[in-house]
Each structure stands twice: as C-alpha cells, then as structure tokens.
C-alpha cells in the first residue's frame, strides 16, 4: 500500500497527521512531492482543504533540515552525539532501563507522549510490560485544567452545536486562526444564516475581527466576566427555570453567591465594561436554548492560568443557566463512545495493568488518573522519584511552561531518551535519540468518528515508503526495546494484527477498509 502511491501515481486515502482532527485526503506522489486531493466524498473526516499546518506537513518527509537520521548516543563528555546501530541503541538503553527498575522499581520509569500518535498503543504496552504506570499524554500541557473543570461539573466536555446555534461565545479560542478548514467553514455558515458570534480575547484575533461582539478581556480574567454574566442571568430572571428545576442542585446557594458578582465588580476585575457584560448576558438569554458558551480548548481556558479549572466550571454554569446542555444549537451531549476491539489475549501475550497509580496523581486527585498530568514529571524528577524518562513525539524543553527550568530538571535524570523526527531542545539534552518516521511513511491504523446517530471507522494509510533507511516507526522502536528488555513476547503482533482485531467486532474487512479509507460500523448509537 505504501509503495503504490509512490510508484504508480495512484491515490491513497489517508488522514492528516498534523493534529487531532484527522482531516481526510487522497494522496498521490507527483514530481517528488505529495499532492493532497480534497474532499474525499463520504469520508467521516472529509475536509474542504488542509490548513496551513497540514499543507506544511506534506513536505516534511523530504525536508532533511534537523532531521534525525540515525540512532544517536550522547558522548560521555557531553560534547555532542555519535551515530550508533539500532542493536547498540536497544541494548544500551535496555541495560539502563532495567538497572533503574532493579534499583528503584518500575515506578521510577516514565514516558511522556505527544499527539497525535497511533503508535501510542505500543508505547503504553511497553511501559506496562516493564511494570510502570507512568505514561502521560500532552493534556497536561494543553487542556487538562479545562477538562477537569467540566468533568467535575457536568461529567464531560460538550461540543458546541455550531450548525444550529443562534448565538455562540468563544473564550480564549480563535477558530479562524487555529482550527480546521471545516471549523472555519462552519463558523462562516453560522454567520451567514444570522447567528451572533461573541469573542472574548485580549487581542483582536481573526475571529474577533469578524465577531458581532468582541469583549477585550484582561488576560486571565475570563472567570470574572463569566460570573458577571451569571449574575445578570439570575438577577434579571433570564435563566431557564424548567432546566434548572429539573437538572440542577444547589441553585439557591448559587443565587446567593451570584448577588456579589455584579457587572460593575466584574468590570473592575476583567476590564470589560459593565454595560457590555449586561448586553452580552441578555443576547445569550434571548437566543437560548440555541445559545452556548463554547467549552473551550487549549490556551487560557485550557491550562494557562491558575484559575483555568474554575473558568471551565463557570462556562458550564452559564450554559446550565441558559438551559442549552443537550439542546440543539447549544452544548451537545457526547455520543456513546465507540469501543474498538483488541488483541485476543489467548493468542497474544498481554502485559498486566500496573496496580500503582501514576506519579503525581496523589498531588492532583481531581485529574483523571488515566490521563495523568505530564507537568508533574518535573516534580517527580526533582523529588527523586522518577529516574528514567522516554520522551516520544514531545518536547518538554520547549512545549511545557518555564522551558529553561524543564531543561535543567531533565538533566537530573539517570536516563533520558527521545524518540522523534527532528532535533528538538529535549532531544539535544537526551542521552539517546532515536529517529522516528513521518506520518506519511507508515500506516497509523484505525480511527473512529461517532456522530449523533451513527459510528464510523477510518484507516490512516501510509503514502510513502520509509525514505531514510535508518529511521523506524515508533511501534518498531518499542518492539525492539521490549525485546532487549526481555518482554518481547508482548509485541509479537503486527500493525495489521491490531487493526484487524479493532474492526473485527463490526464485521469490517481490513483490506477493504484500507482501500476505501473508511467504513460504517452498522451501529446506531444513542446520544
């Protein structure tokens, strides 16, 4: 499949590896470059076009600037790196990993993952095979505060029904500047049919420029603005009585607390004029329940401020007062998740789930323990609890807050291994650096899309063969490390074995799925 597009000019349906969105495109190789054909009719991730990031990613396989081309080992004097063989890399890394396990136990090992990465399945499996629970996603550097606030207020983070809303308010998020082309199109469609767009942002972003109302908030003070809006909704009796009476507990206590959140108080905190706060609250209420304060994403609402969790809870509060939860045009309930199949443990050796909690979970008990908090890695290193770290498709030395401090903390580890495509700040600070391949050079397996009434799966096909002989997909790297660590039996399966097991419950043929790029599961899922 990978060589088909490379050598005969035929198109291969795949998805972009630039972010979570998995925008679908049909790829072919033409004059030494990858050409993306869009849209892919019927594909659940169909997009009109790729965004700037997605277009840039098409050239990455051919761009050797800062590309890691061989396994590298830091010189003993720290003066640079030397290329080594994969066998040497696996053996030497395994020796040091097992040494840490023998001395401190498996909980002294950790891994932090970037996104997106299909090979995270192998990453988790590798750490679990060694007995370590410490696998951390990127949420802790992106949006864990927001997610925690929503999960402890509503149980989930809802999606805004932009297609049907009459009024939507965004905080700390600019769809125009940073989202998929599909999201930009949806926003323009909403404007075209008369929906009101309210943008809360300190600067005049692309979305603020086209908004009906731009609220120029003091950075980090969105919470005060939301509380001021809640005050108006309660004091002017603009909230949804039926929704509150049926679904809400503690409203009397809320009403009492809200009496202090006057628009004038909010103005003193967030710099948005009191009159604008009142007008915004009334505009949202007039459109409710087809009105919504968007749940947010990264940035200031995601994690950037000490009050980001409380800000997410305040967004939930306003949406509840509007009665828009689960309502068309409001904040949609999540659909029932689609559970993929898994490898048969009677055929494939499967590591046990570690019983101990992730390091850091005791300090932040509200954070989902399965998700973890990657930013606690530094605290665990400083305390001496974490001695070995694998960094996969991530860059704490630049992507986490206070990057210089992170680089200093990482130097305290007994072992630091980076697996990535290009040299990064973290890679340059590592003991070993292992070269990954770009997303176009390897199959990335099965993904899912669950809509309001149905569920589909799609396949992320490779477009190119591996262009540099000494680079390897993440799954092969973890399998090699596992074999060197004596747990290779847990990796005696292929990418196709896993993908076939994942779609088997739906009666989907893997070869047909790869050829078409997507398939219906035949399941009707209630929301």
Which residues make up each language-model segment?
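Residues in well-ordered beta-strands of folded domains
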Residues: 28, 38, 52, 69, ...
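Non-catalytic alpha/beta scaffold blocks inside enzyme catalytic domains
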Residues: 60, 144-327, 335, 345-348, ...
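Metal/cofactor-centered catalytic core regions of large enzymes
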Residues: 40-44, 384, 490, 501, ...
